[in-house]
From Swiss-Prot:
GO terms for cellular component: cytosol. This is Transcription antitermination protein NusB. GO terms for molecular function: RNA binding. Keywords: RNA-binding, Transcription, Transcription antitermination, Transcription regulation. It comes from Rhodococcus opacus (strain B4). The lineage of its organism: Bacteria, Bacillati, Actinomycetota, Actinomycetes, Mycobacteriales. The gene is nusB. HAMAP family: NusB. It comes from the Bacteria. Belongs to the NusB family.
Amino acid sequence: MSGTHKKLGARHKARKRAVDFLFEAEARDLDPVDLATERAELSGKDDSVAPVAPYTVTVVTGVAENLDRLDEVISSHLQDWTLERLPAVDRAILRIAVWELFHATDVPPVVAVDEAVELAKQLSTDESPGFVNGILGQVVLVAPQVRSAAAATSRRAETADGESNDARS
């Protein structure tokens, strides 16, 4: 990135808002999906509340639904650290990026990593961008296999649903 400010796209802003919601939910011991949904509803009624992009809700929901697996993957790539020791904002950034790497098929892996590093630069410590990049550099190597397995599982579930619907007919 050059010395000029990079124009931030809608997805970047949505990811940043997702980090905010995940961070706030963890700090306040709230359900992140409820928090994002309530803010989205409130923003429709109150102009003083910033709008919540649909992608923000998608990301927060995806992270919440897959939290245990995401944390397991992140933890497996930490060396001499535990997930709990990471700054909360770094946890939120990593969770979003790993969710995108594994589940957001419309997001190229390089974009998920670059966005996470950019968010770490904006929101966290001086060491965080390199740390986030290092962890995601390892995770990105297994992402294609995880995506393939998820797609196969989804296809099997759809086939099973179709067969059970046929049996009821």
